[in-house]
């Protein structure tokens, strides 16, 4: 009936809001962390740099189900430790989903930004220093604008992956934290209404547009 359809629409809109919220928060944090790590691993000179750099490629090659289960076990151990130490009972929710999404998105941002850093001419920063700029000024006025297309490309890729993620979210979601992919899966288990086809098509189109924009930014940044 009309009431059932209205209720279903309400659940759908809530799932969309949840997906956008998780996507935006995890993308912002992952982009900041990924950029800083890319700079540290490219410019830094510290022991274990190569090993650390290789470790950040693991989320790209490890299957989603392995990551999802591993993170769920990790959160469960943390929750048990907190309950024993402080007597506070923690449960999975937006926090666990966002942390899980940050965990795999950092790697993608790092790879994209690091690729941009590799093509950057170091003499530009040296020229800025020769003109009297300190390291901070040289970074913000020279390095950051050059890195910006790479950072934006990494952010768009991270947001797309977060928006579409089902497996990792499935293992780390809590009550009332249904994202759009989880909502679609829940509806598919009951029946396949026409709305599912429309939502799925829209998700595919949004993903293609975001990935296309990310690739375009990467291509443009490679030329400059």
Regions found by a protein language model. Give the residues of each.
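A structural signal for multi-pass alpha-helical bundles of membrane permease subunits
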Residues: 18, 67-86, 156-161, 173, ...
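Transmembrane alpha-helices
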Residues: 58, 96, 102-103, 109-116, ...
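Short hydrophobic faces within alpha-helices
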Residues: 16, 41, 58, 123-131, ...
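Transmembrane alpha-helix signature in integral membrane proteins
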Residues: 8-41
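Membrane-interfacial helix termini and adjacent extracytoplasmic/periplasmic loops
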Residues: 4-5, 9-13, 43, 48-49, ...
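C-terminal transmembrane helix and the adjacent membrane-cytosol boundary/short C-terminal tail
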Residues: 114-129, 135-142, 197-224
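Cytoplasmic-entry segments and transmembrane alpha-helices of multi-pass inner-membrane transporters
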Residues: 33-71, 125
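Interhelical loop and adjacent transmembrane-helix boundary motif
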Residues: 1, 163, 169-213, 217
